[in-house]
Amino acid sequence: MVPVVALVGRPNVGKSTLFNRLTRTRDALVADFPGLTRDRKYGRAEVEGREFICIDTGGIDGTEDGVETRMAEQSLLAIEEADVVLFMVDARAGLMPADEAIAKHLRSREKPTFLVANKTDGLDPDQAVVDFYSLGLGEIYPIAASHGRGVLSLLEHVLLPWMDDVAPQEEVDEDAEYWAQFEAEQNGEEAPEDDFDPQSLPIKLAIVGRPNVGKSTLTNRILGEERVVVYDMPGTTRDSIYIPMERDEREYVLIDTAGVRKRGKITDAVEKFSVIKTLQAIEDANVVLLVIDAREGISDQDLSLLGFILNSGRSLVIVVNKWDGLSQEVKEQVKETLDFRLGFIDFARVHFISALHGSGVGNLFESVREAYDSSTRRVSTAMLTRIMTMAVEDHQPPLVRGRRVKLKYAHTGGYNPPIVVIHGNQVKDLPDSYKRYLMNYFRKSLEVMGTPIRIQFKEGENPYANKRNTLTPTQMRKRKRLMKHIKKSK
């Protein structure tokens, strides 16, 4: 499960500045979700190749009424669901009563908490943070979020220790791997593969969407149609429920973020919406069903969730619910709006259903399996290189400083989403338009549907880079004789 980091503190201590600095590395989508405090933000960030979800909880005002009553309900939820809490204070303003009230609350939660003193630029860090030791939260990490000073040290000392259980990816010699696989394919041999068999694993399916769009109804319709005994399999400490099921002799695991239990236990008309659960479900899923209310249309919140799904690289099926009862004229208007606002998602299937009455629900699984198969499909290095060569023959890369960008070969870089790694010279100078052309060419050639595809470029190493051209003693003597001859001839 992707770790969650919550930024907590008084207003104007620099939480949003640190949030923007952390999430900028991933160019993360920052979204304000209706129904929460207006300044709450969520984003994806990365440290040394390891991803985490970052939450700006907004300002917490610890007044005489008590910090617990002044905290927004969703801010409390974010703290409870976080793996690590970064408690930020203002080093310039000094220790405030609100800081003490917040610290008292955090100590009572027994949550891993680290004290971060911001705005230490221009100050003696040791003197600036001395008063904050009275909060009893241990070591203090001085930073200047606006300039980035101390942020890297903070990440290394706080976040990385909590991610040690995530095994680092092994570095491989990609050139050697390419030629070994290419030679095996040329000789008619099977290229060596690992033990990963996507068809032997259950498909993890997350159903996400805004409150009251019908996620619970759709989940229960799916389970009810299959007449499966529903039991709650422990998922995470954050109360996401993993529900195993089977359909057409294929195993699935529904990731339930709406708190749905057995049919008889559903009493609330409106689903309890947890942004954290939704984001984590997206990260943990293989395929995401994004449910949209046909009667309300596409909202900014729908687009925010969609952006997070795309950034996560997950396979996607768009489900337009509550389709029944709409007039033909309204249906045409909804379809036009979908085409206009979702025109950039040309790889995702769109289904119009009624979860309440069950119409169209059965067809969802065909698209789910198609998306999963596309995202986990094995493609040989030779085939990817051939496709790349055909793309270059159809449309040459542009000239860069008078020289043509050269693409050498391509190989698989990962799955879910499928990643194609292209090696070449000057590839970092390729314009975005040509990168999009290559992505679309690979998608069309591989017939990838239901999942995004990513293209990564790697520059070929120059063995003479950073080396000086020094002459040998023999070359030096020859050069002197040549220079003398040139001078005499003049």
Curated annotation (Swiss-Prot):
Gene3D superfamilies found in the cross-reference section: 3.30.300.20, P-loop containing nucleotide triphosphate hydrolases
Domain KH-like: 377-461
Disulfide-bond pairs as recorded: none
GO molecular function, one term: ribosome binding
Residues holding GTP 1: 9-16, 56-60, 118-121
Stretches assigned to the EngA-type G domain: 3-166, 203-376
Keyword field contains Mitochondrion: no
Family annotation (Pfam families): KH_dom-like, MMR_HSR1
Binding site for GTP 2: 209-216, 256-260, 321-324
Keywords: GTP-binding, Nucleotide-binding, Repeat, Ribosome biogenesis
A GO biological process held by the record: ribosome biogenesis
Chloroplast listed as a keyword: no
Lineage: superkingdom: Bacteria
Family from the record: Belongs to the TRAFAC class TrmE-Era-EngA-EngB-Septin-like GTPase superfamily. EngA (Der) GTPase family.
Function: GTPase that plays an essential role in the late steps of ribosome biogenesis.
Subunit structure as annotated in this protein's UniProt entry: Associates with the 50S ribosomal subunit.
NCBIfam families: GTPase_EngA, small_GTP
Protein's name in the database: GTPase Der
Species for this entry: Salmonella typhi
